[in-house]
Amino acid sequence: VLVSELLGSFGDNELSPECLDGAQRILKPDGVSIPRAYTSYLAPVTAAKLWNDAKARGDLKHMETPYVVKLHRHALVAEPREAFTFKHPNRSRVIDNTRYAKLAFARGEQTKAATVHGFAGYFDATLYDGPAGEVRCSIYPPTHTLGPGGEKMFSWFPIYFPLRAPVDVPAEADVEAHCWRCVGQGKVWYEWAVTAPVVGPVHNVNGRSYWVGL
């Protein structure tokens, strides 16, 4: 059994895939990993204070860096959508931890106009399959893990991916975005972009503003 506590607010943002891929060589062929799998989610978010705090730093870097934050004055513009999934142990002959997701956020009829300041990120992890079913750990809003008193688990805050410029979304209009998990020589980074209702720039190209070292 390989037990780890490497999950970040976006699931894989603290290099859990790379660390576990390296450690799984000590597992027997029938060995198991805890966690067994995790999926990240993104949702467009209205969060003027977060955006202004990043903008006040006065440079591109701070508008292309994801932040782990406790979301207070915010509103999700659409329901979260699935981004990336990782499973362990990974028995693939060639392991590739790059990922790409095209995310379509349907808002539906009678939704009001909104301003998107970035994206809120979450994760949902399956720790293991127990006698009574799957044991999970999650900050994804629909499945957020609850404590014994019914309170939401407080161990992880969401992650916030800012946009360089806010995007105004008309009433009933949908949002489309793209997100990449990139792996390069000695580093891992994310890139993200909005392509509807307007086409915006790709953020953090080649990890120029933010990356995590391997």
Which residues does each PLM region occupy?
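Class I SAM-binding transferase module
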Residues: 1-180, 184-214
